Swiss-Prot record:
Subunit record text: Component of the Integrator complex. The core complex associates with protein phosphatase 2A subunits, to form the Integrator-PP2A (INTAC) complex.
Region Disordered: start-end pairs: 454-515, 542-572, 629-801, 818-861, 946-1034
Superkingdom of the organism of origin: Eukaryota
Protein name (record): Integrator complex subunit 6 homolog
Biological source species: Dictyostelium discoideum
Function statement: Component of the integrator complex, a multiprotein complex that terminates RNA polymerase II (Pol II) transcription in the promoter-proximal region of genes.
UniProt cross-references to Gene3D superfamilies, sorted A to Z: von Willebrand factor, type A domain (3.40.50.410)
GO biological process: RNA polymerase II transcription initiation surveillance; snRNA 3'-end processing
Length: 1107
């Protein structure tokens, strides 16, 4: 909605009221209150606000136009001043022209095609004035007139300056200047009231501020979309007869009444008051408000089914009261001169009471709808949607009798009613061409008139600016002359007579009081407007001039007085700086003067605060910005931030656990050359986020713990007799390819000599070459002393094409012994082994064997170990696989303390021979070949001494650490490029046979060897000692444990059955009862941390079943 405020800014609006405000200030308060209430409505986002004053200049009169925003509107309202004439007719004419500026271009008025009530641009104009005499620059205007702009006489086919969707509301301010308890009679009706009634608005008189606010609030109910129409009774002979028969009173007139329009598109227009003539060059003039004639004869209320119609509610008026009182249900409405023949025309709608009987609605149908209802009824009932030629002729005659602008909406309505194409397409083509040409002509004329207006206004604005600049120059010249005139007689006299100085001192106050009238001319006040803003400026300037004059007088008089008390009568008006110098006789007089002198400034400043206009009273942000900001309450509580370091650093909180690497703790103490220990700086500790429960370790589950390392030993071939062998091995950090080749040659010679001297039982001790010394204490080698025993086994002979290879298998029982210092490393074959300590492992007697674990699953149908698990290298870059049949390798377990891992073997070892003990008549040797063991991980199987590669991200919690003490072990050791395996009678069920196939491609094996060598190097740097067990399938058990812990950490309760099912599967694999209880207790502890009460109860019941 378009809301336009027209404010009277004449001189009479500056008169004061009883509340101390001027009438202009009251008008500003009314606008602000209107916007405050309107802002509570959601429809305000579609509103546009305009501001027009009563200035005679058409350019400067429009303060807020189409291009300005809402903030500019508020600011311009505050800046209004009373300095114009009260030519309200010109202001209203400008406001209507301003609203109608773009209506022709948007075709809202729809000239010559009927009036569409749903296609409107509703607008209201609110006039705020004092209702005094209307004046202009030349004389006083006796009658209020609203002329039409001369530029729109030919371009606008509307006879009035307003439209049927624009209304004028006026609030006349008749405030009293003197407060009185007597009720004064209301003044006579203002001259603006008839104009408000013509537009469908209303004129109201406000006698005080309270009634003005109430009237502003009442305007909010008028902000409804709709159009204004006039209703007149139809006068003819039939109407007179019906009125006489029914004894009805004469029907009333209802002029300029509101039809409330809903926000939806309609179908049927209200007909024009003329029939458009195609032969004419222009359209006839139309009235702003259509005049609708109504009949008092009762009519039929039948409407065909599925036929569209429009419905509008009529505001309460004398017509509605007449119909409701006489209970007239339905009457037809007509538009005069709407046909080619002048007269009342045919009905286009009806006035009908609603179902509740408390309001009247206007129903709009097609023109001459009674005839159309008959034709449609014949089409549906008689012809069954198959019209005859006679019906088509009658229907075509109906189309030619109605105004041509009804053809197009009727075509759309019949498509909804039936699927027949009853209206030809070319019946209204001539009318459409005529209307289009006429509308184009009207638009072009309006554009040219607007352009001419713009040029004329710009020229007038330039002339006014020139005149204003000349006036300012002339006023400045007059002010300079006035200042020179005032300064010449008011100069202080230089005569020494005290009387002249006293008289000037006495008259200083009166002179300062008249200073405003001397310096400010009344002509200038009239030109600028005598508003509250100018009053505040005058008071402020007068106060400054009076203060300056008094201070200058005080200083001049006090300088003439001496230190002696001024008791003479000539010094009565002199202010003393020292109160003790005042005589007793002058004390009372001086006391009054001192009071005025001290308190006068403060009183003037306080009074000047209350002389501000309303436009300056709302500047809260400027006032608050000038004040000193308050101290923050939380300044004392804020911590002192450091001025150094990283300003974006954030302290970590909720650190529950701190994990420290054991290698870091071991490296804190280092030995220097003199044998003294000194502390090294602590390394950065890694902080873990969430503390998970500690996992079971080997120390808490097994009674024995040993350190294990990858060792290199020479291979020996023993006969079928018991033999005790002590092997001492050591490992170094790294070796080159040349040293590895020399060591491989030596190993081949030693293997041949040992095989020739092994016919009788003997004991031998084999020691590796002295290694080189390592500088890093964390890379110290490990020396292990292993005592083994063998038992005779029936010998079998296996033929193999591969020679110079022997395999030694021994079952070893390992017991912890004392830790000895490592020997120096000087071997050419060295391995990076970051272990903390070295241990010597020996055993003289074997303890009773533990209960056998469940049998291992079969690897494949042929019981063949994949060739990728055993890698053989030679100098010819050929890696053949070694088939071994009918060998029952024992299960082996190598135990180590917690957080230790088995190191990989050197990547390049040649001339390796594999020896086997207790497997008689098996002697296979190979030349220039080596079997390289992969890095051993606790998460992979180790079957028959074959080690599978590990996963880099395998967790430390495995079943290998839990079953290390319940089975025998096999230690694969290598010395000088040979691999040996020993067994004892305490073995568990293993695979029945191992087949080595020698059918793989050499190139593929070479690639596998290179990849495994790379893995060895990476694992050598990332892994420490590993724990290996082959009593159970490690992958399956470890996956079960990880899955159970993951399910416990999930914040759900529907996975308890899955956890119990997986634990049952795990316990069916594990045969040790203590191991089961330990795993179950650790699972309960983890469930307690995550507060799984129902799961804990199930697990406790499971413990009772195991026990």
């Amino acid at each position: 909605m378009l809301i336009t405020f027209v404010v009277d800014t004449s001189g009479s609006m500056s008169q004061k009221t009883t509340n101390g405000m001027t009438l202009l200030d009251c008008s500003k308060a009314a606008i602000e209150h209107f916007i405050k209430i309107r802002s509570k409505d959601a429809s305000m986002r579609n509103d546009r606000f305009f501001l027009i004053t009563s200035e005679e200049n058409p350019i400067t009169a429009v303060k807020i136009g189409w291009k300005d925003n809402f903030n500019s509107f508020i600011q311009e309202v505050k800046n209004l001043q009373t300095k114009d004439m009260s030519n309200l007719g010109f202001s209203l004419q400008k406001s209507f022209d301003f609203l109608n500026q773009f209506r022709v271009q948007s075709s809202i008025d729809n000239y010559g095609q009927g009036r569409n009530p749903w296609f409107i641009e509703p607008a209201i104009i609110i006039l705020l004035t004092d209702g005094s005499s209307l004046t202009n620059s030349s004389s006083i205007i006796e009658n209020f007139t609203l002329p039409k702009t001369q530029f729109h006489l030919n371009s606008d086919p509307t006879s009035e300056p307003f439209r049927w969707d624009q209304r004028l509301f006026s609030i006349v301010l008749k405030f009293g200047g003197i407060s009185s308890n007597k009720s004064l009679p209301l003044p006579m009706e203002p001259a603006i009231a008839p104009m408000c009634d013509v537009t469908g608005g209303r004129c109201q008189v406000a006698t005080n501020m309270k009634t003005m606010i109430q009237q502003v609030e009442g305007l909010m109910q008028k902000l409804q979309g709709g159009v204004v129409v006039s209703f007149e009774p139809l006068v003819n002979q039939q109407q007179a007869q019906a009125q006489a028969q029914q004894l009805l009173p004469p029907p009333p007139l209802s002029l300029h009444k509101m039809l409330y329009v809903r926000q939806q598109v309609g179908f049927w227009p209200i007909p024009e008051g003329y029939y458009p003539d195609i032969t004419s060059l222009s359209l006839p003039m139309r009235l702003a408000h259509p005049v609708i004639r109504y009949s008092i004869i009762e009519a039929d209320t039948h409407i065909p089914e599925n036929f569209p119609f429009d419905k509008y509610e009529l505001e309460p008026c004398p017509l509605t009261q007449y119909l409701l009182t006489n209970k007239i249900q339905c009457t037809h409405v007509f538009m005069m001169n709407s046909l080619q023949v002048s007269g009342q025309g045919e009905p286009f709608g009806c006035l009908r009471l609603n179902s509740a009987g408390n309001s009247v609605n206007l129903f709009v149908f097609p023109y001459n709808f009674p005839r159309l209802w008959i034709l449609l009824e014949d089409l549906t009932t008689t012809f069954k949607m198959m019209p005859s030629q006679k019906w088509k002729q009658e229907f075509e005659g109906y189309l030619l009798s109605i105004p041509p602008y009804y053809i197009n909406p009727l075509r759309g309505a019949l498509k909804r009613f039936c699927s027949l194409n009853l209206i030809p397409d070319n019946i209204d083509s001539q009318f459409i061409n005529f209307i289009n040409n006429t509308i184009k002509k009207i638009k072009s004329q309006s554009i040219s008139k607007m352009e001419s207006e713009r040029i004329i206004n710009s020229k007038q604005q330039q002339q006014q600016q020139q005149q204003f600049s000349h006036q300012q120059q002339f006023q400045q010249f007059q002010q300079k002359q006035a200042q020179q005139y005032d300064s010449s007689p008011s100069s202080p006299s230089s005569s020494p007579s005290s009387s002249s100085s006293n008289t000037s001192g006495i008259g200083s106050s009166s002179g300062s009081g008249n200073l405003a009238t001397k310096k400010k001319s009344f002509h200038q006040i009239l030109d600028q407007g005598y508003s509250s803003d100018i009053l505040s400026e005058l008071i402020q300037q007068d106060n400054e001039t009076s203060e300056n004059s008094e201070l200058s007088q005080e200083l001049s008089e006090s300088s003439t007085t001496g230190s002696s008390g001024g008791g003479s009568s000539s010094n009565i008006n002199i202010l003393q700086r020292n109160v003790f110098d005042i005589g007793r006789v002058q004390l009372l007089n001086q006391l009054d003067k001192m009071k005025d002198h001290i308190f006068k400034k403060k009183i003037q400043k306080d009074e000047s605060k209350h002389h501000l206009p309303i436009s300056q009273m709302g500047n809260y942000h400027e006032t608050i910005g000038k004040r000193e900001t308050l101290r923050d309450i939380d300044d004392d509580k804020k911590p002192n931030t450091p001025l150094f370091g990283n300003p974006y650093r954030k302290e970590k909180s909720n650190q529950r656990y701190m994990s420290i690497d054991e290698a870091d703790e071991g490296g804190n103490l280092t030995s220097d050359g003199e044998g003294k220990n000194k502390l090294t700086p602590n390394k950065r500790r890694r902080l873990s986020g969430r503390g998970y429960p500690s996992l079971p370790t080997l120390n808490s589950l097994s009674n024995t713990s040993t350190t294990t390392s990858t060792t290199t030993t020479t291979t020996t071939t023993t006969p079928a007799t018991s033999t005790n062998t002590t092997i001492t091995s050591s490992s170094s950090s790294s070796s080159s390819s040349s040293s590895s080749s020399s060591s491989s040659s030596s190993s081949s010679s030693s293997s041949s000599s040992s095989s020739s001297s092994s016919s009788s039982s003997s004991s031998s001790t084999i020691t590796s070459s002295p290694p080189t010394t390592s500088t890093n204490p964390l890379l110290q080698p490990t020396t292990a002393s292993i005592t083994t025993s063998t038992v005779p086994i029936p010998s079998t002979t296996v033929s193999s094409p591969i020679t110079n290879t022997s395999i030694i298998t021994t079952n070893i029982h390992i017991q912890p012994t004392q830790i000895s210092s490592p020997p120096p490393l000087s071997s050419s074959l060295a391995i990076n082994q970051p272990t903390q300590t070295s241990s010597v492992i020996s055993s003289s007697s074997s303890p009773p064997p533990p209960p056998p674990p469940p049998p291992l699953p079969i690897v494949n149908n042929n019981n063949v170990i994949p060739s990728s698990l055993v890698q053989v290298t030679n100098n010819n870059n050929n890696i053949p696989t070694v088939p071994v049949n009918n060998i029952s390798p024992p299960t082996s377990t190598i135990s180590s303390p917690n957080n230790q891992h088995l190191l990989p073997t050197p990547p390049n070892i040649n001339n390796t021979s594999i020896s086997t003990t207790n497997v008689p008549n098996i002697s296979t040797t190979t030349s220039n070949e080596s079997i390289i063991s992969q890095p051993i991980s606790p998460t992979h199987k180790n079957i028959a001494g074959v080690v599978r590669p590990f996963r880099p991200n395998s967790p430390p919690l495995t079943i290998d650490t839990l079953t290390s003490s319940s089975s025998s072990s096999t230690i694969p050791t290598t010395t000088n490029g040979s691999l040996s395996t020993h067994d004892t009678p305490n073995t568990s069920p293993t695979l029945s046979s191992i087949n080595y196939n020698n059918n793989n491609n050499n190139n593929n094996n070479n690639n596998n060897n290179n990849n495994n060598n790379n893995n060895n190097n990476n694992n050598n740097n990332n892994r420490k000692n590993s724990i290996i067990t082959t009593t159970t399938p490690n992958n399956e058990t470890n996956n079960i444990i990880k899955f159970v812990h993951k399910e416990i950490r999930r914040p759900t309760k529907d996975n308890h059955d899955i956890i119990i099912q997986q634990l049952s599967k795990l316990f069916s694999i594990l045969s040790d009862g203590n191991l089961r209880l330990k795993l179950l207790k650790d699972t309960i502890n983890l469930a307690k941390e995550y507060k799984k009460s129902s799961l804990i109860s199930k697990l406790i019941g499971y413990i009772d079943q195991i026990k």
